[in-house]
Design a protein with these regions (language model features):
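Amphipathic alpha-helical "lid/sensor" segments that cap RecA-like P-loop NTPase cores
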Residues: 16-58
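Conserved catalytic cores of phosphodiester-cleaving nucleases, focusing on short active-site segments
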Residues: 168, 172, 186-201
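Catalytic cores of nucleic-acid endonucleases
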Residues: 181-183, 196-235
Length: 235
C-alpha cells in the first residue's frame, strides 16, 4: 500500500499451495522488514510516526481503558509496564501470579486486565479451541497486537521469535479462526503452522498431516515450507 505496489490478496488455501510464487515483487524481504517496524498503521508514512504511536499507546492505556473500566490512571501505567514485558519476551503462557507480582497488582484481576487491553487493540491472546468462561478458550499465549507495537515498546530488545509469531497471528486472525496447538505454534482448521527462521528444521511437523514450516528471511516456498511474508497477503 505505502510502496504503490499492486498486490492481490490470497486465501489461506492459495497461500499454502504457493499461489503467491508468481508475484513479481522486487526486494520483498526489505519491504517486509520495513512493514514490521512501521507499516501497520495508516499514518506510517507521516512524519513523527514513532511519537504518534507512543501517544496512541499512552492515551489508550492511561486514559481510555481506565475511564471505560472506572479505574485509576495509575492502573494505566501498570498496563504499559505489562505491555513492555510482553514486547520483550519469548511468546509465553501467562502466569497470572507472576505477572501480577511484576506489575504490582492483584492476581485475581489479571484476566480482566488482559481482556480490557485486548479489547482496546493493544494485545492479542491466543486461545485453545475449547470454550471456557465467557465462551472463550483457555489462553495459551499472549502477544502484542502487532509488530509496530513491539518495536515501539521493546526498542532495541526485540525478540525475533516473538516478532514472527506476532505477525502471523495478527495477519491470519482477520479472516481465520487461529488457535493454539500442542504440536506447533498455531492451528487454523485442519492446518498446523510452526514459525521460525531460515534454518528452522521440520522435525517438529514430520509426523503431522497438513503441517507447514513458516520461515522468515526467505522469498520463495519449497514443499511444505512457506515464507512468512506471504501470510501478509491474506487480506
Amino acid at each position: 500500500l505505502f510502496k504503490d505496489i499492486d498486490i492481490p490478496s490470497f486465501t489461506l488455501n492459495e497461500i499454502i499451495t504457493a499461489k503467491p510464487e508468481n508475484l513479481n515483487i522486487k526486494t520483498p524481504l526489505l519491504h517486509f522488514s520495513e512493514y514490521l517496524k512501521k507499516g501497520y498503521y495508516p499514518f506510517s508514512k507521516e512524519d513523527g510516526f514513532d511519537e504518534k504511536l507512543r501517544q496512541i499507546i499512552n492515551i489508550t492505556l492511561e486514559n481510555d481503558i481506565p475511564v471505560y473500566a472506572e479505574m485509576s490512571a495509575a492502573m494505566g501505567r501498570k498496563f504499559k509496564q505489562l505491555m513492555m514485558i510482553i514486547s520483550k519476551s519469548v511468546p509465553f503462557k501467562p502466569n497470572m501470579s507472576k505477572l501480577a507480582e511484576m506489575i504490582g497488582t492483584g492476581r485475581n484481576q489479571m484476566h480482566d486486565y488482559l481482556l480490557y487491553i485486548e479489547e482496546a487493540g493493544m494485545i492479542a491472546q491466543l486461545r485453545d479451541d475449547t470454550s471456557g468462561i465467557r465462551g472463550l478458550g483457555k489462553v495459551e499465549k499472549v502477544y502484542l497486537d502487532n509488530t509496530n507495537l513491539i518495536h515501539s515498546l521493546a526498542e532495541d530488545d526485540v525478540n525475533v521469535g516473538n516478532l514472527r509469531e506476532t505477525f502471523f497471528l495478527n495477519q491470519m486472525r482477520v479472516n481465520n479462526h487461529v488457535v493454539s496447538s500442542s504440536e506447533t505454534d498455531f492451528k487454523i482448521g485442519e492446518f498446523s503452522f510452526e514459525i521460525g527462521g531460515r534454518t528452522k528444521g521440520n522435525r517438529q511437523i514430520q509426523n503431522l498431516g497438513n503441517a507447514y514450516i513458516v520461515k522468515d528471511d526467505i522469498e520463495f516456498s519449497s514443499d511444505n515450507i512457506i515464507p512468512l511474508w506471504w501470510f501478509g497477503l491474506n487480506y
